[in-house]
Amino acid sequence: MKTIYPFMGLALCSVTAQAQEKPNFLIIQCDHLTQRVVGAYGQTQGCTLPIDEVASIGVIFSNAYVGCPLSQPSRAALWSGMMPHQTNVRSNSSEPINPRIPENVPTLGSLFSENGYEAVHFGKTHDMGSLRGFKHKEPVAKPFTDPEFPVNNDSFLDVGTCEDAVAYLSNPPEEPFICIADFQNPHNICGFVGANEGVHTDRPISGTLPELPANFNVEDWSNIPKPVQYICCSHRRMTQASHWNEENYRHYIAAFQHYTKMVSKQVDSVLNALYSTPAGKNTTVI
């Protein structure tokens, strides 16, 4: 197994080595994941044990940022290596508000596929054409129920994404590959907010509710940046939670940890599939 790099960013690279010397690459993405629940960054909730194990034998970054704090602009930046002001993908809207990445712009997928790699992508796209060069397999949603927390299509699609990635990595191609397992969760937390809009009583859960963070109560709003002061008016999820009480927010944190544990188990399945074949010994995990 090669050095492993779990982090929220990726630099484009060109590949010039001979086929037999080329390493494989596995990129695992978890939409909405924050280091505040990742054990490798000092958290103690036990939400990300497989990720923590990877980090323990690899490299982590403590000062890395996404290209934009919105899904589609961030993804377009990640796969193209260009910032949102260069791609003009500035929001989560589709065309014509946001243009697709031009065909003449190199992408991660095009660079690898043009240099002898099989480039495959499983899971969430939301990329405005920046995944060009990857063979994409759309996941099939697999509905299920959860006794404690609401689940929606985010979680249903992740079941299909996990199955597709596991099947591929369990029987990898002979040529070098770059594979992306692109999970939705813990993005299901957005659906949790919508399902608990306004004043409400939360569904009882097993275990102890997490404590609120130290910065939950703001004593002096004048010291808070303007964008943060007005974020309640800029996204529907903030409006939906605007009348929550402290216990509601503790349930929110518990739900976020729950969705993170769900996707962490799927990450574990993907890694086990990778290491079940000799290809895993020549694969860099990101």
Regions found by a protein language model. Give the residues of each.
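Pocket-flanking alpha-helical
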Residues: L70-L78
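Hydrophobic h-region of N-terminal signal peptides that target proteins for export
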Residues: G9-Q18
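Active-site-proximal cap/lid insertion segments
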Residues: H32-Q45, N171-E175, F183-I286
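Alpha-helical packing segments of well-folded alpha/beta enzyme cores
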Residues: Q29, P50, N104, L108, ...
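Sec-dependent signal peptide recognition
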Residues: K2-G9
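Short beta-strand segments
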Residues: I27-C30, N63-Y65, G123, I178-N185, ...
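Catalytic-site neighborhoods of secreted/periplasmic enzymes
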Residues: A77-C179, F183-I205
